[in-house]
Amino acid sequence: MPRVKRGVTARARHKKVLKLAKGYYGARSRTYRVAVQAVTKAGQYAYRDRRQKKRQFRQLWIARINAASRQNGLSYSRFINGLKKASIEIDRKILADIAVFDKVVFATLVEKAKDALAK
């Protein structure tokens, strides 16, 4: 079996990792061994945070809707329940935008939710 010299593939792998680690601080961007660890950890954080991003935005929307609906005299859960009973299907992202940028429209939505709850 012939001898395999791996200089070319090893260099290519090192270049790939160091390119991914470009911009990192200190040895993390210069030393292959440390850069591999930094790039791997960065990938783990990126994977985890792509999932957490969805949860965090939903939390933010709910907090904004809750604050705006309480200003109009209704808790978040009763507001959402009222919208469902009034068969108004607006998702939380849009509700949060309305709550922040168009308070008059949001107030009318709260009134419709209150009317649906009263029935």
Curated annotation (Swiss-Prot):
**RNA-binding: is it a keyword of this entry?**
yes
Could you list this entry's UniProt keywords, alphabetically sorted.
Answer: Ribonucleoprotein, Ribosomal protein, RNA-binding, rRNA-binding
Which superkingdom does the taxonomy of this entry point to?
A: Bacteria
Query: GO molecular function of the protein, one example?
Result: structural constituent of ribosome
InterPro entries in the cross-refs: Ribosomal_bL20, RIBOSOMAL_L20_CS, Ribosomal_protein_bL20_C
- Where are its TM segments located? none
GO biological process assignments: ribosomal large subunit assembly; translation
Cellular component (GO) terms are: ribonucleoprotein complex; ribosome
**A family per Pfam:** Ribosomal_L20
**What sections of the sequence does the record tag as coiled-coil?**
none
Q: Answer whether the UniProt record assigns the keyword rRNA-binding to this protein.
A: yes
Give the protein's function.
Binds directly to 23S ribosomal RNA and is necessary for the in vitro assembly process of the 50S ribosomal subunit. It is not involved in the protein synthesizing functions of that subunit.
PANTHER family for the chain:
39S RIBOSOMAL PROTEIN L20
Task: Give the record's family classification.
Answer: Belongs to the bacterial ribosomal protein bL20 family.
Report what the protein is called.
Large ribosomal subunit protein bL20
- Which source organism? Shewanella pealeana (strain ATCC 700345 / ANG-SQ1)
